[in-house]
From Swiss-Prot:
Protein name: Na(+)/H(+)-K(+) antiporter GerN
A Pfam entry, by short name: Na_H_Exchanger
Family recorded in the similarity comment: Belongs to the monovalent cation:proton antiporter 2 (CPA2) transporter (TC 2.A.37) family.
Effect of a null allele: Disruption causes a major defect in inosine-dependent germination, but does not significantly affect germination in response to L-alanine.
Membrane topology: Multi-pass membrane protein
Domain of life from the UniProt record: Bacteria
Gene Ontology biological process terms, A to Z: sodium ion transmembrane transport; spore germination
Major location category of this protein: membrane
Keyword set, alphabetical order: Antiport, Germination, Ion transport, Membrane, Sodium, Sodium transport, Transmembrane, Transmembrane helix, Transport
Subcellular location(s) per record: Membrane
Transmembrane portions of the chain: 29-49, 54-74, 87-107, 114-134, 149-169, 175-195, 219-239, 263-283, 290-310, 324-344, 347-367
Cystine pairs: none
């Protein structure tokens, strides 16, 4: 019945708050508990909540607002100053995971095309979970977090181009590589121009309207417009939302927007996003794939941790900061889930492997929060010991 959706929302909000609190009491970031509770109340365990189109859309709004908040908290000058490090981290986080995924696929008996796609899937990075963990830890404004966010942007661009190339080369889709690259150029050129000139003008134009919360509404209009524009041109909507947050952070409206959007995001939409990730897991028919799942999870974690960490180390970060950046890039999150769905529909990913890979993606997402907490803790202890 349609009204059962109201109960589902109430259950999601209650369970995420309780699970987040328990996670903090156990010394872990709150996001870990929220991810786990999605598995518990979802189809995999209790089955109280089933995936639906409405929950999916609420989840999409949640991740868009989460990345918009990350953009608001990002220092543009710091982001620009760390662009070389971000690019190196992104490259390290693509090359090693691709090789690891491709070789693993061949060893496990996959066909050539499936192995290539597995390598590309392991290249994906979603820092939305890392962003929440950094907020929990009070580390959003560190150099490491800025580098992670910049690397995620580069990673998204490169992975989309590589995916388009693979689909074209393997003959599974009619993909125009020139058009794919052109769309990326148009997106970022437009975002820079609109963010520099258009966003301040839009905020000034809409803020005097004699209606309630005109400034917040103006900010959300910009946020969702940027996200839509990104999706339209083949860039993840979360990148558009992140860019919108950065653009508004350069205006005088930053603090008011941040103060008023945060309750909207965290009271309703972000909890649905966290639960929806866990709800993607199902344990049906995975008994004979358990070793594949465990092996691929280890490969997925180590290749990102080492590859991204190496990129950071080569651009001036010390060992502990490099480990932090590597840990923050491990999560594949919703980005990899979308790519997996694309691979399944295009024939690049066999149905036999789909469920197992979804579980691997979610395991990497759940591993990220405790890894970030541990690596930041190790750095903080070292800094205190040196004083």
């Amino acid at each position: 019945m349609e009204f059962e959706f109201f109960f589902q929302i109430a259950l999601i909000l209650l369970s995420t708050k309780l699970a987040g609190d328990l996670s903090v009491r156990l010394g872990q970031p709150s996001v870990l508990g929220k991810l786990i509770v999605g598995i518990v109340i979802g189809p995999a365990v209790l089955g109280w909540i089933e995936n639906s189109e409405l929950l999916t859309q609420l989840s999409n709004v949640g991740v868009i607002l989460l990345m918009f908040m990350a953009g608001l908290e990002t220092d543009l000058e710091e982001l620009n100053a760390n662009r070389n490090s971000s690019l190196a981290v992104a490259l390290g986080g693509i090359i090693l995971p691709f090789v690891g995924g491709y070789v693993s696929g061949l060893v496990m008996g996959m066909e050539q095309g499936n192995a290539v796609f597995l390598g590309l899937l392991l290249c994906a990075t979603s820092v939305s979970i890392s962003v929440q963990t950094l907020r929990d830890l009070g580390k959003m404004k560190t150099r490491e977090s800025t580098t992670m966010l910049g690397a995620a942007v580069f990673d998204d661009i490169l992975v989309v181009i590589l995916l388009a190339f693979a689909m074209s080369f393997l003959g599974t889709d009619d993909v125009n590589l020139t058009m794919v690259i052109l769309k990326k150029v148009v997106f970022f050129a437009s975002i820079i121009l609109i963010g520099w000139k258009g966003v301040p003008a839009i905020m000034r134009w809409l803020s005097p309207l004699r209606v309630s919360e005109s400034i917040v509404s103006a900010a959300l209009i910009i946020c969702f417009s940027f996200a839509y524009f990104g999706e339209l041109l083949g860039i993840a909507g979360i990148i558009g939302a992140f860019a919108a947050g950065i653009a508004i952070s350069q205006t005088n409206y930053k603090h008011e927007v941040e103060k008023k959007v945060e309750p909207i995001a965290y009271a309703m939409f972000v909890p649905v996003f966290f639960v929806s990730i866990g709800m993607n897991i199902t344990f049906d028919g995975i008994g004979n794939q358990i070793w594949f799942i465990l092996a691929l999870t280890v490969i997925a974690v180590l290749t990102k941790l080492i590859g991204c960490g190496f990129g950071a180390r080569m651009t001036g970060f010390d060992a502990k900061s490099s480990a932090i950046i590597g840990a923050g890039m491990v999560s594949r999150g919703e980005v990899a889930l979308i790519i997996a769905g694309t691979g399944l529909s295009s024939g690049l990913l066999a149905q036999d492997y789909f469920t197992a890979i979804v579980i691997v993606v979610i395991l990497t997402t759940m591993i990220t929060p405790p890894m970030l907490k541990y690596t930041f803790g190790a750095k903080d202890k070292a800094m205190k010991a040196s004083k």
